[in-house]
């Protein structure tokens, strides 16, 4: 169960009705493929299960960056309490120290390498892949390597020439919207996690919005998109295991909504915080600083832990005995409530996402929820939510700088 409650004044439906129609039209057009991913993942899961069923491996190394890795890390962190088939490590940066640390600590013959790049030409990913090949010097990469990429990409052509397994990403699904495609499903199957439940959760979110006509998400998008002063959106997650989801949200929100149309610039800056620890750093800025922030809280109702504060009374610290005997998970959720109400009392726009427990189904719901929210705000801004021209400029400059260094 995932429930979203809004603590600000809602708009009249007449104000948001046109945006609902445009979001429906976009989803039905077939041009933006992520909308349909909840309905088309079963074949990928079946194919992945067939591939991994006879494989013997202790480690999985995922090589990818941005949308090819950040969502997988969110899954790994959120579900780390579950027993997994292997240990997953992620190489998502040109960091030689981390590369050495990982490659020197695993046994090649008991490792599956997943090379993940939608375009197939991501310089960081391919550079790390080359370094892996140079380090291990495998005679047959089809035994240990699989590839996730666009159909027809240069990386797919390389994989096919090497007789290696390839999983494709639909052409009309952008990288940061691809977590419900092979990008997320294949690593989940490799880890022994319930990938079907992830899709079921996302399908439930889709049904709630498009079939049940729940306007909560649209109201939230409209309020945040049209807020006069608040151009910073804080996701305050009260669970350590949601730190990865925060990172995924930051990429999705920033890369999708930070756009320029002519001389007009758009964007809502995303910030991910983890409660309660970030109450002791960032909360002061939200409470007493510039009123340029809205806050979305997430709390997990059942954290699957009965750990309590011991009934101990320490000399000179007995003023803190009021927490004795209370579950830590209950305390952290009460901290969420207290912080939220403190912000409401200050007139700050907040909303609360309550999750019954952290499992594959609810995680799938959250992924689809934030993707829909991003699309809705993009429509309200009138920007192209699905491109990233600012990033492409940097890539071209990088190539010219590297070539210049080689002269």
Stretches with model-predicted labels:
Residues 241-354, 361, 375-377, 381, ...:
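C-terminal catalytic subdomain
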Residues 57-210, 396-400:
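Glycine-rich phosphate-binding loops that contact phosphosugars or nucleotide phosphates
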Residues 48-49, 141-296, 390-407:
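Active-site phosphate/pyrophosphate-binding segments
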Residues 50, 96-105, 219-223, 339:
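Short, charged beta->alpha transition segments
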Residues 68-70, 97-98, 121-123, 153-156, ...:
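Flexible loop/turn segments at secondary-structure boundaries
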Residues 1-53, 312-326:
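Extended, charge-enriched "interface" segments that sit outside catalytic cores
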Residues 117-122, 173, 187-193, 240-241, ...:
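A generic structural motif
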Residues 77-80, 105-108, 130-132, 161-163, ...:
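Short, solvent-exposed amphipathic alpha-helical segments in soluble enzyme
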């Amino acid at each position: 169960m995932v429930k979203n409650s809004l603590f600000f004044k809602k708009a009249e439906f007449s104000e948001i009705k046109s945006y609902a129609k445009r979001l429906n039209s976009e989803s039905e057009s077939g041009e933006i493929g992520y909308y349909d991913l909840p309905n088309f993942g079963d074949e990928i899961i079946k194919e992945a299960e067939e591939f991994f069923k006879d494989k013997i491996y202790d480690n999985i190394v995922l090589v990818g960056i941005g949308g090819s890795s950040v969502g997988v890390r969110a899954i790994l962190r959120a579900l780390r309490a579950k027993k997994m088939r292997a240990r997953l490590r992620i190489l998502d940066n040109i960091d030689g120290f981390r590369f050495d640390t990982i490659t020197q600590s695993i046994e090649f013959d008991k490792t599956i390498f997943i090379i993940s790049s939608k375009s197939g030409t991501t310089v960081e990913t391919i550079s790390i892949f080359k370094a892996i090949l140079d380090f291990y010097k495998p005679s047959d990469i089809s035994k240990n390597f699989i590839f996730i990429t666009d159909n027809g990409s240069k990386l797919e052509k390389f994989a096919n020439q090497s007789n290696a397994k390839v999983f494709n990403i639909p052409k009309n699904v952008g990288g940061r919207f691809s977590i419900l495609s092979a990008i997320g499903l294949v690593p989940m199957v490799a880890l022994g996690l319930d990938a079907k439940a992830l899709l079921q959760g996302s399908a439930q979110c889709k049904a709630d919005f498009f079939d049940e006509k729940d306007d909560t998400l649209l109201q939230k998008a409209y309020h945040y998109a049209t807020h006069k002063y608040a151009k910073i959106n804080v996701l305050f997650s009260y669970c350590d295991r949601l730190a990865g989801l925060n990172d995924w949200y930051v990429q999705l929100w920033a890369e999708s909504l930070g756009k320029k149309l002519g001389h007009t610039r758009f964007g809502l800056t995303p910030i991910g915080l983890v409660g309660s620890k970030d109450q002791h750093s960032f909360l002061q800025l939200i409470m007493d600083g510039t009123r340029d922030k809205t806050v979305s809280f997430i709390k997990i109702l059942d954290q699957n832990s009965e750990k309590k504060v011991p009934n101990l009374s320490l000399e000179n610290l007995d003023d803190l005995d009021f927490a004795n005997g209370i579950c830590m998970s209950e305390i952290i959720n009460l901290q969420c409530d207290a912080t939220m109400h403190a912000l409401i009392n200050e007139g700050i726009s907040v909303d609360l996402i309550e999750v019954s427990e952290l499992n594959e189904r609810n995680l799938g719901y959250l992924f689809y929820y934030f993707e829909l929210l991003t699309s809705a705000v993009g429509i309200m801004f009138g920007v192209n939510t699905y491109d990233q021209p600012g990033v492409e400029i940097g890539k071209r400059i990088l190539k010219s700088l590297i070539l210049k260094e080689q002269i």
